[in-house]
Amino acid sequence: MRHNQMCCETPPTVTVHVKSGSNRSHQTRKPVSLKRPILKDSWQASEKNAHNNKPKRPRGPCLIIQRQEMTAFFKLFDDDLIQDFLWMDCCCKIADKYLLAMTFVYFKRAKFTISEHTRINFFIALYLANTVEEDEEEAKYEIFPWALGKNWRKLFPNFLKLRDQLWDRIDYRAIVSRRCCEEVMAIAPSHYIWQRERSVHHSGAARNYNRDEVHLPRGPSATPVDCSLCGKKGRYVRLGLSSSSSSSSDIVELTGKRSQELHNSLSMDMIGDPSQANTYSQVANDHQSKKENETNFVKKTKSMGWFAESEE
C-alpha cells in the first residue's frame, strides 16, 4: 500500500497571496468605489488564514498493511477446503479477485488478529462481500454448505448473525472501492488468487430465471455445474496451489483426475454419437496441453517468498 496518498482537502500547491490592511492604510485613498473591495479582501484573507490553520487531514481512512497480516490471509488458501471451493467456483462468480480483495479489506477494518484469520471468518467476509456487490442472490448461497457442512440448513441462521456481527465490527463500512481493491492486489500481484478474472459474460446484472436447471446450493460433494456461457464442459480455471503448501505433483494429480473425468464424460458422448470420436481426440490433446501449462506455472511461480521471510 502506498503511503504517499495522504492528501489534504486543500491542494497543497495552491498559494494565496493577500496584502494586509496595514499596508493599505499608508496608501493614497482612491475614489470611494475601492472601499468595498478592501473589505472583501480583508474578509477573504481572514477566511483563507482560518482555513490554512486547520490541521491537515487525509482525504479518507487508509489501511496500513503489515506483512504478517497479508501472510496470514494468504495462508487461508492453503486450506484444502478453500482450495476446493475456489475450484468449484470455476466461473469466478462467487470469489473473483475483487471479492477476495474485499474480504481482506474487511479483515483489516475489523482489526482481526492473526488468530482470527480462520476459515469461518473467510467465508463470512466473502458472503458479506457478495451481499454488497452481487446482484445475483442465489450464487452466494453456495457458501453455506462449504462453511457449515452437511447440517448447514440448521446452522445458516447463526451464520447470518455472524455476518451481521462482522458488519457491525467494521462500523458498517462494507463498501470497498475498486481502487482500494487494486492497491491491495498490487502488494503481491503474482499470487494466484489475484488471477481469478471473471469473464465479461458473467458481469453485470444478468439473472437466470430458469430455476429448473441448477438447484443451489450444491455443496462440496458436487462437481462444478456446466456453464452454458463458458462452454458445455465449463471453463478450465487454474487452481494455482500456493508453493508453501503444495508441490507441482499435487496439481498434476488434480489435473490428472479432471482429465480422467473428462475422458469418461466424452466416452459416454461417443457411445451416443460415434461421429464425435475425432472431436474427442482434439479435446483430449488440448486438455493435456493445458495440464502441462499448469504444471509449468506452479514450477515457475514462487509468488509469496517475500511474505514467508521473517521481518528484519
UniProtKB/Swiss-Prot annotation:
GO CC, alphabetical: chromosome, telomeric region; endoplasmic reticulum exit site; nuclear envelope; nucleoplasm; nucleus; XY body
Region (Speedy/Ringo box): 67-199
Pfam families xrefs: Spy1
Cellular localization per UniProt: Nucleus
Residue positions where Phosphoserine is found in the record: 221
Family annotation (InterPro entries): Speedy, Speedy-Ringo_regulator
Sequence positions bearing Phosphothreonine: 223
Main location group: nucleus
One function term, GO molecular function aspect: protein kinase binding
GO biological process: DNA damage response; establishment of protein localization to telomere; G1/S transition of mitotic cell cycle; male meiotic nuclear division; meiotic attachment of telomere to nuclear envelope; oogenesis; positive regulation of cell population proliferation; positive regulation of cyclin-dependent protein serine/threonine kinase activity
Keywords: Cell cycle, Developmental protein, DNA damage, Nucleus, Phosphoprotein
Subunit structure: Interacts with CDK1. Interacts with CDK2. May interact with CDKN1B/KIP1. Identified in a complex with CDK2 and CDKN1B/KIP1, where it interacts primarily with CDK2.
Family classification: Belongs to the Speedy/Ringo family.
Functional note: Regulates the G1/S phase transition of the cell cycle by binding and activating CDK1 and CDK2. Contributes to CDK2 activation without promoting CDK2 phosphorylation, by inducing a conformation change of the CDK2 T-loop that obstructs the substrate-binding cleft prior to kinase activation. Interferes with CDKN1B-mediated inhibition of CDK2. Mediates cell survival during the DNA damage process through activation of CDK2.
Comment block on domains: The C-terminus is required for CDK2-activation, but not CDK2-binding.
Name of protein: Speedy protein A
Organism: Rattus norvegicus (Rat)
Lineage: Eukaryota, Metazoa, Chordata, Craniata, Vertebrata
